[in-house]
């Protein structure tokens, strides 16, 4: 357990003890007594302090988590940009070259078959 968590636990226990003390004073002296009213103010002050510390700790944890996630998101964004800028253009160029090569091989094959077999094969550009 970290020191911050120990402090939070102590604060919660302190609030509980102050509430028990307030209930005791209320039963003993009544709700309108000066000590009961003073203890009620003490309970509110201690509870507010505990809630403030808890909120601070929660904010610190969330901020730390966001900083960790920010670094990971930035790395992923950098990878995506690299893939987008480099590999897409290279892949598109490779696919265009492959298509041109396939079209050339197809045209050569059709011409060879037409010449060898004395057939009049038409190259269909729509395919």
Curated annotation (Swiss-Prot):
What is the designated name of this protein? Protein UL96
Alphabetical GO CC annotations of the entry are: viral tegument
For the keyword Coiled coil, the answer is yes
Localisation per UniProt entry: Virion
Keyword Coiled coil present in the record's keywords: the answer is: yes
* Superkingdom of origin organism: Viruses
Q: Which UniProt keywords apply?
A: Coiled coil, Virion
Coiled-coil annotation reads 60-109
The record's gene field reads UL96
Protein family (similarity comment) = Belongs to the herpesviridae UL96 family.
């Amino acid at each position: 357990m970290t020191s911050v968590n120990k402090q939070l636990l102590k604060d919660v226990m302190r609030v509980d003890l102050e509430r028990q003390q307030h209930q005791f004073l209320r039963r003993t002296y009544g709700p309108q007594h000066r000590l009961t009213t003073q203890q009620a103010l003490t309970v509110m002050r201690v509870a507010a302090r505990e809630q403030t510390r808890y909120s601070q700790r929660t904010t610190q944890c969330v901020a730390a988590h966001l900083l960790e996630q920010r670094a990971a998101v930035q790395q992923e964004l950098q990878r995506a940009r690299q893939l987008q800028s480099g590999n897409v253009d290279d892949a598109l160029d490779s696919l265009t070259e492959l298509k041109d090569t396939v079209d050339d091989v197809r045209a050569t094959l059709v011409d060879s078959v037409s010449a060898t077999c004395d057939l009049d094969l038409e190259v269909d550009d729509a395919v």
